[in-house]
């Protein structure tokens, strides 16, 4: 709840609508013990190329290769009729998780993927049209159209 309190406010300061939305968003955390498989994904930092380390901001590329891997795991699970959820919020407790699974010190916790049999299969998701978030050449250039 520390993350929620820091980013969205406490129960005392949140509107009723926001409380409902936060409760919906945190339902996964409250029922994680009911999910049969917890796939804890670690990244061997000794082989990671942090190409944006001098950018003066947190790295956005350091673990870039791990998320396509996770997506492939999720797609394979889906093909078998399984559902998945991914979260990175467990990283706040990396030291405790490291001790629990005895992960090496030079490995980083990338994500937790929950895998189980879904109560119902999700509908096909709708996506924003590509031209609403892509440009040609530069940000003030013409929109990219598919």
PLM segments and residue spans:
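Short linear motifs at secondary-structure transitions and domain/linker junctions
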Residues: 12-18, 86-91, 109-110
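Low-complexity, flexible helical/coil segments
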Residues: 16-19, 72-80, 120-126, 145-146
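Solvent-exposed alpha-helices and their adjacent loops that cap or buttress functional pockets
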Residues: 30-33, 101-106, 126-127
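C-terminal helix-cap and adjacent tail motif
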Residues: 109-146
């Amino acid at each position: 709840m520390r993350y929620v309190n820091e980013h969205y406010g406490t129960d005392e300061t949140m509107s009723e609508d926001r409380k409902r939305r936060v409760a919906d968003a945190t339902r996964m955390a409250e029922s994680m013990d009911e999910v049969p498989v917890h796939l804890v994904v670690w990244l061997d930092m000794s082989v990671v190329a942090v190409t944006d380390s001098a950018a003066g901001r947190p790295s956005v590329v350091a673990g870039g290769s791990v998320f396509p891997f996770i997506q492939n795991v999720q797609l394979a699970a889906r093909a078998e009729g399984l559902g998945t959820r991914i979260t990175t919020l467990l990283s706040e407790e990396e030291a405790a998780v490291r001790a629990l699974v005895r992960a090496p010190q030079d490995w980083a916790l990338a994500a937790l993927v929950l895998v189980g049999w879904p109560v119902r299969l999700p509908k096909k998701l709708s996506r924003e049209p590509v031209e609403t978030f892509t440009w040609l050449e530069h940000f003030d250039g013409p929109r990219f159209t598919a």
